[in-house]
Structures are given as structure tokens and as C-alpha cells.
Design a protein with these regions (language model features):
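Flexible, glycine-rich loop/tail regions that form catalytic "lids" or insertion modules at the edges
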Residues: 1-114
Length: 114
């Protein structure tokens, strides 16, 4: 499995949405638990994402609403990101593995249907 995390996502107030560096271990623990079958997550357009209750929140006041904010998949933002990836891929020309272009195209189609 491949896991993707955006530690630098900003909230509406222009501050980092995720609490900080030391709390990254909470997500890394979830990744290990997922690989080892101790958690199942929930399906999303991008794959499997953690459920709020699967993260160890001990010692941190991080609400379900805040978690929903950091795991939200905004269609327009993602379509913009994928457009940028397409431009970058086009610069690679024939050197780009076809599978990467196919994955990008598949994600774009999924977001367009959402």
C-alpha cells in the first residue's frame, strides 16, 4: 500500500489544520495498524482513510469536526491538483510510465463523478 498525507494543509483561519509534528506519530501508528490489519478505515475516492475512532487521540483535544476538516476531499481543489499533475506529466512526454497517467486520469474521472 501507498499512503499519502498532507501535513501542511491549512484551515479557514490560515493556520495548519493538523496539530503539529509530534502528532504525526498518531497517523503513522494508524498506517502500521492498517497494514497489520488492526484497523479497517473507510473507503474514499483516494482509497482507504482512517476513521476518527481509529486514531489514538490520547492527550490531544482534536474533535471529530476538526478531523473531518483535515480528511475532507474538496472536489475543486483535487481537480485543480490533478490538472497541475497533468501539466507536469505532459512535460515528461514518452518518458512518463503509462500507468502513472492512467492513475491520474482515473482519479480525475472519480472526482468528476463525485
Amino acid at each position: 500500500p501507498i499512503f499519502v498525507v498532507n501535513w501542511f494543509r491549512m484551515n479557514e483561519q490560515g493556520k495548519f489544520a493538523w496539530p503539529g509534528f509530534g502528532d504525526n506519530a498518531r497517523v503513522l501508528k494508524w498506517i502500521i495498524d492498517r497494514v497489520e490489519g488492526r484497523v479497517v478505515g473507510e473507503k474514499s475516492i483516494l482509497g482507504t482513510m482512517p476513521k476518527y475512532e481509529e486514531i489514538d487521540w490520547s492527550g490531544l483535544d482534536f474533535t471529530k469536526e476538526e478531523f473531518a476538516g483535515v480528511t475532507n476531499l474538496d472536489k475543486q481543489i483535487w481537480l485543480g491538483e490533478l490538472a497541475g499533475v497533468k501539466e507536469w506529466f505532459e512535460k515528461m512526454g514518452a518518458k512518463l510510465p503509462a500507468r502513472l497517467a492512467a492513475i491520474r486520469d482515473d482519479l480525475e474521472a472519480k472526482f468528476n463523478k463525485a
